[in-house]
């Protein structure tokens, strides 16, 4: 319910600002992992992470919902532009009245997937299961940005 109320408030702001009627998006709760939310522009849909929402309800609703809605509003108003470009920043600040933040700071302990330790010449890196599997299947290799060495699975 909080999500729908926030969406309505923000849509009302955008409708008044642009003097037009934006189509309300559909909302689903199917995002997994560390992402808080995703906007699907052509489908006019916002997908949210239900675990992060339940663990951070008011902050999540006040930050993530306007963030994703701003992507949809920008697409409807300006077409295809940079995801966090000047139009999106303007939509966040001027229209919706919220800071134009591109990353959330929620605790992702309960949603983070399994991590695999890899080493290089200077440090240990933790890779996702997707990257780990790509390495194991000889489809990909990853290089440390600092020392430029190929990452190797750290044997315990």
Curated annotation (Swiss-Prot):
The active site is at residue 68. One of its GO terms (cellular component) is cytoplasm. It holds the Pfam family SprT-like. Its cofactor is Zn(2+). Keywords: Cytoplasm, Metal-binding, Zinc. Binds 1 zinc ion. It is found in: Cytoplasm. One of its GO terms (biological process) is response to stress. Zn(2+) binds at residues 67, 71. HAMAP family: SprT. PANTHER family: PROTEIN SPRT. This is Protein SprT. It comes from Glaesserella parasuis serovar 5 (strain SH0165) (Haemophilus parasuis).
């Amino acid at each position: 319910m909080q999500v729908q109320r926030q969406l309505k408030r923000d849509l009302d702001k955008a409708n008044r600002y642009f003097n037009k009627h934006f189509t309300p998006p559909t909302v689903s709760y199917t995002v997994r992992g560390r992402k808080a939310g995703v906007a699907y522009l052509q489908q006019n849909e916002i997908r949210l992470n239900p675990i992060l929402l339940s663990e951070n309800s008011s902050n999540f609703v006040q930050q993530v919902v306007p963030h994703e809605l701003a992507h949809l509003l920008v697409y409807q108003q300006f077409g295809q532009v940079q995801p966090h470009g000047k139009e999106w920043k303007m939509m966040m600040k001027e229209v919706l009245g919220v800071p134009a933040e591109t990353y959330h700071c929620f605790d992702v302990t309960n949603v983070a997937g399994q991590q695999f330790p890899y080493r290089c010449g200077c440090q240990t890196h933790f890779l996702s299961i997707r990257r780990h599997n790509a390495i194991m299947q000889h489809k990909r290799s990853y290089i440390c940005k600092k020392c430029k060495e190929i990452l190797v699975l750290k044997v315990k």
